[in-house]
């Protein structure tokens, strides 16, 4: 499969290379998604998770990108709630290969069904901004049921 990889932390965006990589395989509770649209922010190049795994071991060459929309092509052992051929969107794990590729292996819990009337590019643009808004309202703002919110100047992605 084609994928954009990074290998040199100091090269920044100039260090991104389009290359051939093996297609991922689905582990337990994983889903393989054929990517139709993907999101990427340049600051990912500064995140430790782009370069290391959860044990802080080097994982380069790595594939950046976290937001995605696409179609399920395979299910790992024990995966439930999704089916092959289903349209989905979601967030890839920060410490695994990302979404700047033709396929990604992702935990099923990080995906949601994408309605048929929602374009893949729209679906891929929602996860980070939606999560950021949710965290702002509920985790940081401690919003409770029945409370009101004024969204002043709500013109950005969040």
Model features per residue range: what roles?
Residues 12-18, 53-54, 131-132:
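Short gly/ser/thr-rich secondary-structure transition/capping motifs
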Residues 43-49:
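Cytochrome P450 core scaffold surrounding the K-helix E-X-X-R motif
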């Amino acid at each position: 499969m084609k994928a954009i990889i990074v290998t040199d932390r100091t090269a920044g965006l100039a260090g991104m290379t389009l290359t051939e990589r093996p297609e991922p395989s689905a582990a337990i509770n994983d889903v393989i998604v054929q990517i139709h649209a993907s999101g990427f922010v340049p600051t990912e190049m500064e995140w430790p998770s782009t370069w290391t795994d959860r044990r802080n071991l080097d994982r380069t060459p790595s594939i950046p990108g976290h937001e995605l929309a696409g179609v399920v092509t395979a299910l790992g052992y024990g995966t439930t709630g999704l089916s092959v051929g289903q349209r989905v969107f979601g967030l890839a794990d920060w410490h695994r290969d990302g979404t700047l590729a033709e396929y990604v292996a992702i935990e099923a819990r990080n995906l949601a069904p994408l309605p048929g009337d929602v374009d893949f590019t729209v679906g891929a643009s929602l996860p980070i901004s939606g999560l950021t808004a949710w965290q702002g309202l509920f985790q940081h703002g401690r919003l409770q049921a029945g409370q009101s919110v004024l969204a002043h100047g709500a013109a950005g992605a969040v």
